[in-house]
Amino acid sequence: MAGLNEEQIRYLFAGDLLAQGIATSYGIMELQIPLFGLYGACSTCGESLSLASMAVNAGCAECAMALTSSHFASAEKEFRFPLEYAGQRPLSTTWTVTGSGAFVLAAAGSSYAEGASVCITGITTGKVVDYGVKDSMHMGAAMAPAAADTIYLQLRDFGREAE
């Protein structure tokens, strides 16, 4: 954990795609770090980073961790059809990644942030934008309007332009 031990991480913001966040719960059980469990599908990484950065910035934690994991089969089971069903997938179907990522966030100026070259300077939280896409095989099409809206708000709110 970035050279830290469990006692140095005040809060863990983590989630996965399984019901009740079971992969997260079992994966971090032995760490005994206070957990804020998240369930946001593709947004879990951004959501956990946002919440952890707010906790650190507010002085609630000198050091917090953001963690996300995803598994292709879990998305199939939760949102489409279980793999055992053996349903035929259209060639244009979107796929869920199997992967995980973890980030340790620390307050600027803290000994934990020594040598860090990345800083969260602001966040833009998305909202539900529903154009009525109902095809579970094309989740990207369902998520695209909200993603576009969030990107637009990020650029507007922070006075930036697309490059």
Segments from the language model and where they lie:
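Glycine-rich anion/phosphate-binding loop at the beta-strand->alpha-helix junction
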Residues: 43, 58-72, 78-84, 89-90
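Conserved beta-ketoacyl condensing-enzyme motif
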Residues: 1-43, 162
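Solvent-exposed alpha-helices and their adjacent loops that cap or buttress functional pockets
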Residues: 5, 27-30, 44, 56-60, ...
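Active-site-proximal alpha-helical scaffold in enzymes
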Residues: 39-66, 105, 145
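Structural signature of cysteine-dependent C-C bond-forming condensing enzymes
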Residues: 2-11, 58-68, 113, 157, ...
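Condensing-enzyme catalytic core mediating Claisen C-C bond formation in acyl metabolism
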Residues: 82-153, 157-163
